[in-house]
Amino acid sequence: MIREERLLKVLKAPHISEKSTMVAEKQNTIVFKVAVDATKAEVKAAVAKLFEVEVETVRTLNMKGKTKRAGARVGRRSDWKKAYVTLKAGQDIDFMGAAE
């Protein structure tokens, strides 16, 4: 059993991009930025508990941080992990809330 404290630290934010929007509309898949050390089981449990939905599959990938320049200085952004969470048919996550 995964502790609730850990589940709250697994998901960082939804990842909003053109690709993630298309995937959400066509395949009922939500993209999240997750902790680098998070496992697929932890991501699945966190999404199911926090959003009260049924998760079908979870696919994860490590994203390499980009190299950035500021004049002569060269820096690097941190590496991060992305998770594609496919929900079962009929399930949906409403990030906007119930604004009436």
Swiss-Prot record:
This is Large ribosomal subunit protein uL23. One of its GO terms (molecular function) is rRNA binding. One of its GO terms (biological process) is translation. One of its GO terms (cellular component) is ribosome. The keyword RNA-binding applies. Gene3D superfamilies: 3.30.70.330. One of the early assembly proteins it binds 23S rRNA. One of the proteins that surrounds the polypeptide exit tunnel on the outside of the ribosome. Forms the main docking site for trigger factor binding to the ribosome. Keywords: Ribonucleoprotein, Ribosomal protein, RNA-binding, rRNA-binding. Part of the 50S ribosomal subunit. Contacts protein L29, and trigger factor when it is bound to the ribosome. It comes from Aeromonas hydrophila subsp. hydrophila (strain ATCC 7966 / DSM 30187 / BCRC 13018 / CCUG 14551 / JCM 1027 / KCTC 2358 / NCIMB 9240 / NCTC 8049). Disulfide bonds: none annotated. NCBIfam families: PRK05738.1-1 (NF004358), PRK05738.1-3 (NF004359), PRK05738.2-4 (NF004363), PRK05738.3-2 (NF004366). InterPro entries: Nucleotide-bd_a/b_plait_sf, Ribosomal_uL23-like, Ribosomal_uL23/eL15/eS24_sf, Ribosomal_uL23_CS. Belongs to the universal ribosomal protein uL23 family.
